[in-house]
């Protein structure tokens, strides 16, 4: 008899989150999968065509049965709308999950990005049906929240901390992306080491392709191209690139271009900061693109850029874009504390700088820009080699399945 897994995740296809491919991978491994997710509206708070409060509430995606709960859209990406979005999905999904009580699953799997409260409906089903719950911790709370919303009130901070830890403790098993995050989860939950696994993120196989676009290559042929691809929010701290560009301008280096592919709550702020600093000639904002187009921009790049806001606990995680970048086979420029930079150093796949250190980033850009092309190509080859050895889809999927169903 086939094993059955219920996945709880606020975000799912058609939003660009890796859980969609993980669910597909489970099906490929002869597992029946149901998903309880929200209404697609990330990152700009706008529903794609064909979706609504009562439209497409049940779908099929690559053999995965998808069920959608209500949530308040994050339209406008104001602090209030994000807060309402964060609390509305777990609220509505906790009622929606009751309709699943007549179904039998071997495991519940929560893919926890922000907010941590999306774990709650998974806890509800797990406890009522006595089915083990495994949560993949992609965003550590409350630390990730503080990188997005500036919460200074001590009472609120303590409340968020206690409720976040409560959710982690109620899971039967946890998955961390890195050894450092593993240690932190063991410490805050009191769980045994056997109940907390370290499994890195993988990226979809299409990231491993080199796809040339003649039009883009012609457009940027006279530039050293640094590509940032992904969400643009306070947690990413993309503005560090603006400060580095100002140093490049003062140094008289004019043929470097930051190509920003993506959208998010901070995009307008970053564009305004670029204008304020007078470095518009160093930036092109291309907006959001289909995730399957990312190999085009990775192939275009001379270097791929991965920043993260300064935070001791954010440094415990490896951003998903770092994994995707390494598969792309290009040198990676990080501006990250902790694990995200450590993996690049270990793989000899690029140059690293501390979070928020625009001077160090500027120096690394100049170093990479000035080095022979063969040395950059060697870094890119190292990145792709490390990807196939440690982050391949087949290996990570099997590790996930074994741990969840054990």
Spans of model-derived segments:
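N-terminal subdomain of nucleotide-sugar transferases
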Residues: 1-60
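A short, well-ordered alpha-helix in the C-terminal region of glycosyltransferases
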Residues: 126, 360, 367, 374-389
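Nucleotide-activated donor-binding/catalytic signature segment of Leloir-type glycosyltransferases, i.e.
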Residues: 261, 268-295
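Conserved donor-binding/catalytic core segment of Leloir-type glycosyltransferases
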Residues: 219-236, 241-246, 259
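Nucleotide-sugar-dependent
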Residues: 236, 286, 290-297, 304-326, ...
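Carbohydrate-associated surface elements
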Residues: 39, 180, 199-202
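Membrane-proximal helix-turn-helix segments that form the acceptor-binding/catalytic region
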Residues: 124-128, 155-174
